[in-house]
Amino acid sequence: MSEKKGALKVIPSASEEQLVQALGDLLQRCSQEALAKHDKFSVGLSGGSLVQLLTKALKSCNLKTAKWVFFFCDERYVRLDDSDSTYGAYRAEWLTQLPCIQESQFVRADTSQPLDACAADYEAKVKSQVDRFDLLLLGMGPDGHTCSLFPEQPATLQETKRLVIPIRNSPKPPPERITFTLPLINKARNVAFVVTGAAKASVVKSVFVDLDKKFPAAWVNPTKGQLTLIVDAGAGKEIETLK
């Protein structure tokens, strides 16, 4: 059974340039709103294609980022210098190309700890700095997963107390991870999915039009926040009714 989502804002992009501009505009708006109310702008990052897209957005937009703090919506349980590390991917891109970003602005997971302790420690770090995230930037896989919430592991969607949980036997390598849970995600002021590629067109429709709950991304519904979907022409080709 589908449940009605709150207001969804869809931003279609005909080109990568338009998508990067939309991402930059989103960052600017959310940053201005956050810094008008408190002394920092809290952002949750996701990996994959978002790393490059965000790098391009920040390079093309003249944004003041000194008061931005970056967390990770999920992280692979690997060494921070491993090629699979989401933190490592951002560090490699941003610290070499974006002089406005400092390493101290990243709040990273301590993957040297046992997996359960790593998740609990990261939850404590989140709680100590953030009540509600100002912006979470999420991707979505062709299987409808987001963060490290996978359709093959539906029990993760039922978590009600913990904000960060360990993941074992992930269907997508590497097998061990930590991830934000729905209570934390759905409390955010702004949640934005950034989805590209025609291979994801069908699941975009299933999640955002049909609200099919067999896909974890369909459970994302910020109850007191704004949900935004930024799509390129390929990913958005089956959702004309939402545009």
Swiss-Prot record:
A Gene Ontology cellular-component term: cytosol
Swiss-Prot/TrEMBL catalytic activity: 6-phospho-D-glucono-1,5-lactone + H2O = 6-phospho-D-gluconate + H(+)
Keywords: Hydrolase
EC number: 3.1.1.31
Listed InterPro entries: 6-phosphogluconolactonase_DevB, Glc/Gal-6P_isomerase, NagB/RpiA_transferase-like, PGLS
Pathway: Carbohydrate degradation; pentose phosphate pathway; D-ribulose 5-phosphate from D-glucose 6-phosphate (oxidative stage): step 2/3
GO BP of this protein: carbohydrate metabolic process; pentose-phosphate shunt, oxidative branch
GO molecular function: 6-phosphogluconolactonase activity
Described function: Hydrolysis of 6-phosphogluconolactone to 6-phosphogluconate.
Alphabetical list of PANTHER family matching this protein: 6-PHOSPHOGLUCONOLACTONASE
Family in the record: Belongs to the glucosamine/galactosamine-6-phosphate isomerase family. 6-phosphogluconolactonase subfamily.
Protein's name according to its UniProt entry: Probable 6-phosphogluconolactonase
Native organism: Drosophila melanogaster (Fruit fly)
